[in-house]
UniProtKB/Swiss-Prot annotation:
Ranges of compositional bias, category Gly residues: 203-212
The species this protein was found in: Pea early browning virus
Gene Ontology terms, MF aspect: structural molecule activity
GO CC, any one term: viral capsid
Subcellular location: Virion
Protein name: Coat protein
């Protein structure tokens, strides 16, 4: 990498954007494509979200002493985009407690004594009944579904926002023109590694050069 620095960097607006989130266009499109393929209702897909987001590189492509990347396009992420990414990350942490316990949502089984009659005798049977609101399992399931709806809504809204986001891509030329920056390379010092010249003498003890 050629050493140098941007002249006038402190007075430019670029100085305030060094610590902002930037994305390389190709990397952004790939991560967004993978997010669009995920089905939030599936726990296996929710578990993939952190890994997908971790592949998104949001480092700045420039500093005062690092020239804007050449041959690539980058875009600055606005505040709302960063919030949407954080919402997707938070939603991915959702897990249904009922699912983790291998429970069946909304159904409880119990053994009940069927009434006897003159035609059918007394027998033991398993009856599936709708849960009552007083059932602790039902209350837990309602609470779990409520959180799932919130998490699912947050995920889909945030993902749709990112998909519809129109990023402004900049390459090196665009960036330097926009912020009126000039890159100045650091001069390379040429070191003299040659030693002093020693007069040569002829073999056999003859007179050296310059001797009359």
């Amino acid at each position: 990498m050629v050493k140098g620095k941007y002249e006038g960097f402190s007075a430019s607006g670029a100085k305030d954007l060094v610590f902002s989130a930037w994305v390389e266009v190709g990397n952004w499109n790939e991560v967004l494509r993978r997010l669009m393929d995920l089905k939030f209702a599936l726990q296996a897909d929710r578990d993939k979200i952190p890994g997908v987001l971790s592949d998104l590189n949001m480092e700045s492509p420039f500093t005062r002493f690092k020239r804007f990347s050449d041959g690539e396009e980058y875009a600055l992420l606005i505040k709302e985009a960063n919030i949407a990414i954080a919402q997707i990350q938070a939603a991915s942490a959702f897990k249904r407690r009922a699912d983790e316990k291998n429970a069946v949502s909304g159904l409880l089984t119990q053994s009940a004594q069927q009434p006897t009659s003159s035609i059918q005798g007394s027998s033991q049977a398993t009856v599936v009944r709708p849960p009552r609101e007083s059932d602790s399992a039902f209350a837990e399931d309602n609470f779990s579904f409520g959180k799932f709806d919130d998490a699912s809504t947050a995920f889909h809204k945030a993902r749709s926002y990112l998909r519809g986001l129109r990023l402004v891509a900049l390459d090196q030329e665009d960036f330097e023109e926009k912020f009126k920056l000039v890159w100045k390379e650091t001069p390379q010092q040429q070191q003299n590694v040659t030693g002093p010249t020693v007069p040569a003498t002829s073999s056999g003890g003859g007179k050296g050069p310059g001797v009359a």
